[in-house]
Amino acid sequence: INENTKILDQIREGCVPFFNINFNKKKLKIINLYNQGQKSNHRLYNISLGKKFTNGFVRNGHDVLEVSDRDFLRNNKSFSLIPNRSNFQTFLINTFKNYNPDILFFGHTKNVEINTLDSFKSINKNIILSQWNEDPVMPSLNYSKQNISNIKLYSDFVDHNFITTDPLILNKTVNRNNFNFFFVPVDKNIESLDVYKMKPKKDLFYAMSHGVNRAILKEGIEDDRINFLNRLVNKIPDIKYDFYGFANKQPIWGNDFNNALINSKMGLNLSRGKPTKYYSSNRIASIMGNGLLTFIDEKVQMNDFFNKNEIIFYKNINELADKIKYYSKNEKVRIKIARNGKKKYFKLFNETKITKYFIDISLGNKASLF
């Protein structure tokens, strides 16, 4: 019997070739590579897009294997205490062989070598490589220059790039043929607060930093947002502000951020750089997704997604000041717009819809952002 079994196995192996693909394309295997933030004790858990993407992929029925590149390198240093990039490449390739993913989805890394991506393609010619980046890419902003450079490391090699700014702005800096816009998602388990149902004592919330990898502010940094906030405070000094990263108040993170958020009726969605079509930091998910009435410059063109009964647009700082004063005193209309805004945000850009959009583009299906 054993000899017959061996013969049958040999016949099967000779007749049926091995294809290195996942036949059930409705259920994909995805490696999601991003910084999980062990070094910072997970203080960024509530603003981590990588975490939201994992949640969205899983809730859409896919399997996800998470890899934290920076944590691996930090935890696997050589005897000289230098991160061992070579070991990380070996780890990635062996993990890839064991898991055999359909998609490698990675963001904000420079730790994956092009040769490693080449190896992935050699192992599985059907692999789909996608890069995402949530930071600003407007060429006029000094901060963006390094970010664009980081994106360009992989942009021509991967199948798809996803950014939080209208890709048209990159017309002269990269080949944008494989670039797609995505909206910062909200997640029902993360943006879980309904501030419009509460009784906040402060009027206006704003939190900024000099980069999420720094817990504190840098000295000697010029920031247009500081100038804007100073002018705003001078125009309406009677408003009860709750600003962080401003006027010698350090940034706040994690649960401290949420505890501060619920104390304000309204939030200012002011991102670094000039107002640019569709770009917002993930601040918008935190304030709008948690039910604060949200103010945003009309030049960001969010009116393509939201109307005046869901978010408050302003043309300039004078109009912003007037509207802050008005809505701070008119509770019913403030609550109504804040509720509408959160509802619309979750309808259009929740974690399952955004990750479905990623998958549709990756598989060449008809894709719609909303």
Summary of predicted features, one role per range:
Residues 1-79, 83, 99, 108-115, ...:
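Nucleotide-sugar donor-binding catalytic core of glycosyltransferases
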Residues 2-10, 329-362:
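A charged, aromatic-enriched C-terminal amphipathic alpha-helix characteristic of glycosyltransferases
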Residues 80-95:
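A short, well-structured beta->alpha microelement
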Residues 96-97, 120-121, 261, 324:
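Short hydrophobic patches on amphipathic alpha-helices
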Residues 96-104:
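Proline-aspartate-enriched helix->loop->beta-strand connector
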Residues 127-144:
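A short, histidine- and acid-enriched strand-loop-helix "catalytic/donor-clamping" loop
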Residues 139-143, 190-195, 322-324:
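Short, charged, surface-exposed secondary-structure boundary motifs
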Residues 311-317, 326-331:
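Conserved acidic donor-binding segment of nucleotide-sugar-dependent glycosyltransferases
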